[in-house]
Amino acid sequence: MVFFVVFMLFSILILRLGELQIVFGDDFKREIERTEDITVNNPVPRGKMFDRNGKIIVDNTPLNAITYTKYQTTTQKEMLKTAAQLAKLITKDTSKVPVRDKKDFWIMKHPDEAKAKITKKEWDLYNQKKLDDKQIYKLQIDRVTDEEVESIQGEDLETLAIYRDFNSGFALTPQIVKNKEVTPEEFAVVSENLENLPGVDTTTDWERMYAFGDTLKSILGDVTTSEAGIPKEQLEKYLAHDYSRNDRVGKSYLELKYEDVLHGQKAKVKNVTDKAGKILSTEVVSEGKRGKDLVLTIDMDLQQQVEKIIEEEMWSAKQKPGTALLDRAFVVLMNPHTGEVLSLAGKQIGKDSDGKTVMKDFAGGNITTSYNVGSAVKGATILTGYKTGAIKPGDYLVDEPLFFKGTPKPKKSWKTFGSINDLRALQVSSNVYMWKTVIAMGQGKYIPKGPLVIDTEKTFSTMRQSFSQFGLGTRTGVDLPNEMSGFPGSDNKPGLLLDFAIGQYDTYTPIQLAQYVSTIANGGNRVQPHIVKEIREPIMENNELGPIVEEIQPKVLNHLDMKDEWIKRVQEGFKMVMQVGDGTGVGTFKGVSYNPAGKTGTAQAFYDGPVKSQKNAEVMNLSLVSFAPFDNPEVAMAVVVPWAYQGNTGPSINMAIGKRVMDAYFDLKKSRPVGGTAEGVQQSGNADTTQNGQQSGQ
């Protein structure tokens, strides 16, 4: 009976095995032979940047690099073993290894000692499922002593640093282990031992190289490191566009603004793996292509000269009394017809890491900082007066001290000019002419020693709307991130409206001033400034330009809602400032050959810079706007020097910078075979003077 039962059981087993082999055999075979296709994106170098004349500004320097690719089946123990082997062959920076990682590593290296850190009572709770693995591990971490952490030194610490890199990415995605200061000896010895270092490879990486050093550096922007990868706040956006977490991306200015252009097309590699995750074959799906190149509107020869001029004039001014708070200056040069920015320069005096006083690049301040700029805006005040009917071209008003009820001191120009017309008011920078214009604009009337009664709310609105047509108090649209619009004053008192009319209330950025004077220079078109001139396909030859993908066209944001003859009249007034009689710019620009026009500016302001103890100290801001040549403007310029000096007199650094920059521009144009800073580019003028001992407002 027993034999029969055993026989039947074996028969059933044989039949079942036969069924599995015959009926399901193919299914099992397919399961065993099942493979998986995994496509990995490998990064490529970023696009380069050139100046308008084809000079390389930002390049990629090749670097020897050591990478690690984790397979799907790679265990923690295997990674640790490979890391230890690699640590014997290379040196690895360990300064960024956090204490927590050292504790984790100590526990991995000393499992028995780590286990002993848990009490018998705690193990009993664990066995009773009242403590879980996570809680036990936390207790172990908390009990690793400082001495045990400090015991991780030398090769062990380098092993940990390498292991951290191994473990930082996803399976089948190469991670940079070392790409800085890889010695030829390290590169060679690792290459020779690759068969003993599973997942490790030697390759070529890149880093950004700036051909002109710190020149324009703040505008060019920065790129994240492969270690930092994509910033957390932008992770979702970039992952949705096929980026990897450790990809290097632009994090400021041009590198950020044109990330989608500069990033390039990644190489795609298909890895075929078996069921266990072992790679069976690798196929290149697409080779990838370096990011597209940017050709900037900037002329780097001019940019270097402008920066040198700013530095020299600032150091010179700092030797004079009253300039303790002077720490920055800005210059913008742009083509008034196309909006191409030829130079965007800013410098700031500060301290380096050793506490030494140095001059730093602050070109970004042209779009991210704003100031009271003084009388440079009087062209907009006059044109707004025409538009509202407060004055007509040729109207005469008496420049005299103005006495208002409740105001002990009279309000006056830097000099009493008597009866003057609009052109003369611009030429000599009359404050009183502007004040009487804005009083009329507000339906008021000047009564000596009487109250100032005007509709301030409506007039502020009218003037700000009008000024915005020139680009004052509104973003210019420049192709850079983080542009600010300036700050409008928050109060509507009548006296503040008078300050507004002479540029001493609302604040404006240097690039807004450049757009404003360009609008006047070109006859009324507010043109959007731009830093990028062209986008080009990359080519492999040494720093040569490829075919044009896109050429940035001039963009007119708006046209002044004003008569052409009004604009021409203000242009004439600006010419008188620079070239006629006692114009406030004549002393500096008399006799120059490039036929400039412009407007000087001085503003009584309150300090709000980095020296906290001097907050709200009275200071003088200096500015200058200009264009040239007068008959056919090629270039527009804005100069802004905040907090230039304290007291009634000080160095006219705005004029010194402006004159030298204008001269440099035209000298550079003459020195070139075809003339001009580049094809079709023109130059810029400058204007704005401070007369010693005179009230601000010139």
Language-model features: locations:
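Membrane-proximal periplasmic segments of bacterial cell-envelope enzymes
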Residues: M1-D260, K268-L280, S286, V438, ...
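Cysteine/selenocysteine-centered motifs that mediate thiol-based redox chemistry or coordinate metal-sulfur cofactors
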Residues: V5, L9, K92-K103, P111-D112, ...
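Solvent-exposed, acidic/flexible segments
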Residues: N42-P43, T75-A83, N179-F187, M209-L216, ...
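Short N-terminal helix-loop-first-beta-strand/juxtamembrane motif that initiates sensory/input modules
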Residues: R46-M49, L197-D201, S316-M334
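Beta-lactam-recognizing serine transpeptidase/beta-lactamase-like catalytic domain environment
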Residues: V58-D59, N64, V272-E287, I298, ...
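Solvent-exposed, polar/charged alpha-helical surfaces in well-ordered, non-transmembrane soluble domains
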Residues: K77-K88, A188, E192, K217, ...
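A conserved hydrophobic secondary-structure block that centers on an alpha-helix together
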Residues: V284-F330
